[in-house]
Amino acid sequence: MCSTMSAPTCLAHLPPCFLLLALVLVPSDASGQSSRNDWQVLQPEGPMLVAEGETLLLRCMVVGSCTDGMIKWVKVSTQDQQEIYNFKRGSFPGVMPMIQRTSEPLNCDYSIYIHNVTREHTGTYHCVRFDGLSEHSEMKSDEGTSVLVKGAGDPEPDLWIIQPQELVLGTTGDTVFLNCTVLGDGPPGPIRWFQGAGLSREAIYNFGGISHPKETAVQASNNDFSILLQNVSSEDAGTYYCVKFQRKPNRQYLSGQGTSLKVKAKSTSSKEAEFTSEPATEMSPTGLLVVFAPVVLGLKAITLAALLLALATSRRSPGQEDVKTTGPAGAMNTLAWSKGQE
């Protein structure tokens, strides 16, 4: 029937249930496509320098998705491409995922540890996503974290960047310390702090340049490039990188492995809540009774003592009362009575 009609006429003759089904199915595919495009994988650029035998921390934050089965790590070198870790399946000796939750429900941390690093670990590491049905994954040549490994017999590098803090916990309003030690000189160029990774990262402190007012440098020594973050809030949560830049050509020369900052809201204790829930000038009737009960009892005790003393005085003998109360006139009458007896 619809084959001989135009598209609008055909749709007009369809039952309402088919029209509803068409409306549901078409946006469904579009929304699924947009949700896949909303994914964003954030990882530091590097290069990072690690000594042979140490542990390498590779950070990766996926924004907009928390599906473990669709994320994996791939190492690309001049020789080949190798899968380092797959969150969906497989056994990878020496590689462990970082178990860490984020404050945002759709932001997930897919960072990994590589233990006992060797020279074979030199290369560029990509945190990539795949569709879950095939092993095809998308990688871009300008992304990934490059890693350099110093062997036991290699000469000392001209620069080391050490960020010893993997995780820092703070409370709203606190001042947080982010540690960075730079050993060596390297090429001429500044040291900068960044929050985040990829194109969305933000420069927060530039030694010798313009910086945010809430960040201050510590600089306890010439090698100390640590900073203080004052009055932190939930917006300050994230990963911070201490990075060395080369002035000519203007490029990133070396990066630290990053420090993750988590900020929690300041909580009020139960005792503080009791004191702050009611004004200090108000008091319940029970409280008034507790305060005034000792005072009332004290007044009753004093009154009772006074009554007992008055009662004891009124019951004294008449002779004692005459002697005690005799005045000058009474003394003369007593003297006259004694003379008459003589």
UniProtKB/Swiss-Prot annotation:
Where are the residues of the annotated region Disordered? 317-342
Q: Which SMART domains match?
A: IG, IGc2
Report whether Transferase shows up as a keyword of the record: no
Q: Which residues are glycosylated?
A: 116, 179, 231
Domain of life, source organism = Eukaryota
Q: Which Gene3D superfamilies match?
A: Immunoglobulins
GO CC, sorted alphabetically, is: plasma membrane
Question: Which Cys-Cys disulfides exist here?
Answer: 60-127, 180-242
Q: Give the range the annotation lists for the signal sequence.
A: 1-32
One of its Pfam families is V-set
Q: Return the PANTHER family for the record.
A: SIGNAL-REGULATORY PROTEIN BETA
Q: What is this protein identified as?
A: Signal-regulatory protein beta-2
Q: Which organism is it from?
A: Homo sapiens (Human)
